[in-house]
Design a protein with these regions (language model features):
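Extracellular/periplasmic helix-loop-helix junction of adjacent transmembrane segments
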Residues: 95-128
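Glycine-rich segments within core transmembrane alpha-helices of 12-TM secondary carriers
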Residues: 208-242, 249-256, 445-459
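Central cavity-lining transmembrane alpha-helices of secondary-active solute carriers
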Residues: 119-135, 358-370
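Extracytoplasmic gate region of multi-pass secondary transporters
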Residues: 95-96, 308-373, 427, 460
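Helix-breaking motifs and short loop linkers at transmembrane-helix boundaries and internal kinks
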Residues: 106-107, 132, 141-142, 163-169, ...
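Intracellular terminal tails of multi-pass secondary transporters
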Residues: 1-86, 92, 100, 264-299, ...
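Conserved MFS/SLC helix-loop-helix module at the cytosolic interface between two early adjacent transmembrane helices
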Residues: 128-169
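C-terminal ends and interior cores of transmembrane alpha-helices
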Residues: 152-165, 178, 390-403
Length: 529
């Protein structure tokens, strides 16, 4: 044991000797480093280019990167956007169904808040399954099979909503819908992190825009689900003896099931388990990940149990700060679950109301991409979250302060972009802040997303009809949760700035990719602030 320690100290001393003189400071010694064995192991498996890539000329590697980028982009992006459009529509079409007569047909008791309970119960199932689902996928590494299967099941459940005849049936269907849909969002965020980093020119720095691409599915569905719902509501009510709300669930559920069949052979897996990549392309994909974070994630994930990642995530204080940040944003964004009902308070017919829900989402798509693009271009995260939150808070205050039509619709136009612009960049900030190991990253993403969506459980009861048109309680709570996010973002930025200063000095930082002491500055890893 003593000889092993001696050899390790010699290795570190050699590394230190190479680094002394670069900045005039002596790096941290091996005795100052926690978990030295793990650190040395990471360094031993670090930046070593695979032989299959080392023999390529620069021109050949550029050609290989171009081919890899095209393969992944053409297979991945269109399908995940389409899947998320359908995921979001199937989850939130109950808001449009309310305008189409669902509460009346099922004899829901407004005094008992039965409709609100039907909305909130989905997020109970969503919360319970989020972490197990994503840790399971991180272990098996087969999203190309797992996700389409989940999609097929949630499409069937969504279509089955048309058959419910009472409150109990609606509750059961909504619970299981949330249970199955929990697999989707964070899972695809993990796939993005693995696959898109392989093809991006600046890896982690571009994660904000790629996250915006993923989340554009939700925004597009918000923009066009109103149009679809308006068409069904106006033209299919009473067709074949079914109400408009029943056709809404049937049509959208059948489309989801149909798309899931195509997803089975279109979707990719993680880099090492993607069958339609050549051996050279797999090696390059994994190497791009190693270049970005300093080591091979797969080695970590192969040796970690499903719950090891959860333990690591819970032990990191940054996970909890990120949790409060995302919880505040998602809680304020719960207004989108009832957006048709909120817009209905402007006094227009059901069809016009559904059409009026579209412009805020169109604006959201545009502003979210601009904000995410600029966040990636500058490498900055904090202000790209704070400024949209200021806009959202102002919109909520305006909505609660007046009953005038024009100012209230302006508030509705601004509250959705403000929340989503901040949300997309905050999601990217999670992966930027918790880059490794992969099991920890998976657990953190799932845990944060699950708990933050739990806010929708109580938020459902703040948008009852009796609270219209200003929804003062809801708008006030939204302002409070936005303030919570602002404080959390400020605390996180302060923490990351301090950690980056340590990295500048070559000091070991747990969770960062330092290799051996004194080499962090050379490899260039920094937490995004």
């Amino acid at each position: 044991m003593a000889s092993e320690k001696s050899d390790l100290e010699k290795a570190v001393s050699t590394e230190e000797a190479a680094d002394i003189g670069k900045d005039g400071e002596k790096p941290t010694t091996v005795k100052d480093i926690p978990n030295v064995a793990d650190l040395t192991q990471a360094n031993m498996r670090g930046l070593r280019m695979p032989e299959i890539l080392a023999r390529l000329t620069p021109e050949q590697r550029l050609e290989l990167e171009t081919r890899l980028r095209r393969k992944i982009d053409w297979r991945l992006l269109p399908m995940i956007i389409l899947m998320y459009i359908l995921n979001y529509i199937d989850r939130n079409n109950i808001a449009a169904a309310k305008l189409a007569g669902l509460p009346e047909d099922l004899n829901l008791d407004p005094n008992a808040s039965e409709f609100q309970t039907a909305v909130s119960i989905l997020f109970v199932g969503y919360l319970l399954m989020q972490i197990p689902s994503n840790l399971f996928l991180n272990k098996i590494g087969k999203p190309a099979i797992y996700l389409p299967a989940c999609m097929m099941v949630w499409g069937v459940i969504s279509a089955a909503t048309a058959a419910v005849t009472n409150f109990g049936g609606l509750i059961a269907v909504r619970f299981f819908l949330g249970f199955v849909e929990a697999a989707y969002f964070v899972t695809w965020l993990l796939v993005l992190l693995e696959l898109l980093v392989c093809v991006m020119m600046n890896t982690r720095k571009e994660l904000g825009l790629r996250t915006a691409l993923l989340y554009s599915g939700a925004l597009i569905s918000g923009a066009f689900s109103g149009l679809i719902s308006a068409g069904i509501t106006q033209n299919m009510d009473g067709a074949r003896g079914l109400g408009a709300w029943q056709w809404l669930f049937i049509i959208e559920g059948v489309i989801t099931v149909g798309v899931s069949f195509f997803a089975f052979w279109i979707l990719p897996n993680f880099p090492r388990t993607t069958s339609w990549l050549s051996e050279e392309e797999k090696a390059l994909a994994v190497w791009r990940l190693e270049e970005d974070i300093g080591e091979d994630d797969w080695i970590d994930s192969e040796h970690q149990s499903l719950w090891t990642g959860a333990r690591l995530a819970f032990a990191d204080v940054k996970t909890w700060v990120l949790l409060f940040l995302l919880f505040g944003i998602v809680a304020s964004g719960s207004v989108t679950n009832f957006f048709p009902a909120v817009v209905k308070t402007l006094g227009y017919s059901n069809v016009i109301t559904l059409l009026l829900t579209c412009p805020p989402y169109v604006l959201t798509v545009i502003t979210t991409f601009i904000n995410a693009w600029h966040a990636d271009r500058t490498g900055e995260r904090f202000w790209h979250i704070m400024l949209p939150l200021v806009v959202a808070m102002a919109a909520f205050i305006l909505a609660a302060a007046t009953t005038s039509l024009a100012p209230r619709y302006v508030a509705m136009m601004l509250m959705v972009p403000g929340v989503y612009c901040a949300f997309v960049v905050a999601l990217a900030w999670i992966s930027n802040t918790l880059p490794r190991p992969p099991a920890k990253r998976a657990a953190a993403l799932a845990f944060i997303n699950a708990v933050s969506n739990a806010s929708s459980i109580y938020a459902s009861y703040m948008y009852e009809d009796r609270m219209a048109p200003r929804y003062v309680i809801a708008m006030s709570v939204n302002c409070g949760t936005i303030f919570l996010s602002m404080v959390s973002a400020t605390v996180l930025r302060f923490m990351l700035v301090r950690l980056n200063k340590k990295l500048d000095q070559g000091i070991y930082v747990k969770g960062a990719i330092n290799a051996l002491p004194g080499t962090a500055a050379e490899h260039g890893f920094r937490f995004k602030v």
